[in-house]
């Protein structure tokens, strides 16, 4: 019983961590694109 609870919460935490990493990756990618756009504007 305790094992099941542990596995459940462990899976939840893992899911939250991977979701957070995914969000960070997306945010970083968007910021990178934005920086590239700004760089292009500055060059023009």
Curated annotation (Swiss-Prot):
Sites bearing Leucine amide, chain numbering: 44
GO biological process terms on file: adenylate cyclase-activating G protein-coupled receptor signaling pathway; growth hormone secretion; regulation of protein localization
InterPro entries on file: Glucagon_GIP_secretin_VIP (IPR000532), VIP/GHRH-like (IPR046963)
Assigned GO CC terms: extracellular space; perikaryon; terminal bouton
Keyword Endoplasmic reticulum annotated: no
Entry keyword Cytoplasm: no
Compartments (UniProt record): Secreted
Domain of life of the native organism: Eukaryota
Keyword terms, alphabetized: Amidation, Secreted
Gene Ontology MF terms in the entry: growth hormone-releasing hormone activity; growth hormone-releasing hormone receptor binding; neuropeptide hormone activity; peptide hormone receptor binding
Cross-referenced Pfam families: Hormone_2
PROSITE patterns: GLUCAGON
Family according to the record: Belongs to the glucagon family.
Physiological role: GRF is released by the hypothalamus and acts on the adenohypophyse to stimulate the secretion of growth hormone.
Descriptive protein name: Somatoliberin
């Amino acid at each position: 019983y305790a094992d099941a609870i542990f596995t459940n919460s462990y899976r939840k935490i893992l899911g939250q961590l991977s979701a957070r990493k995914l969000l960070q990756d997306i945010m970083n990618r968007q910021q990178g694109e934005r920086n590239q756009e700004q760089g292009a504007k500055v060059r023009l």
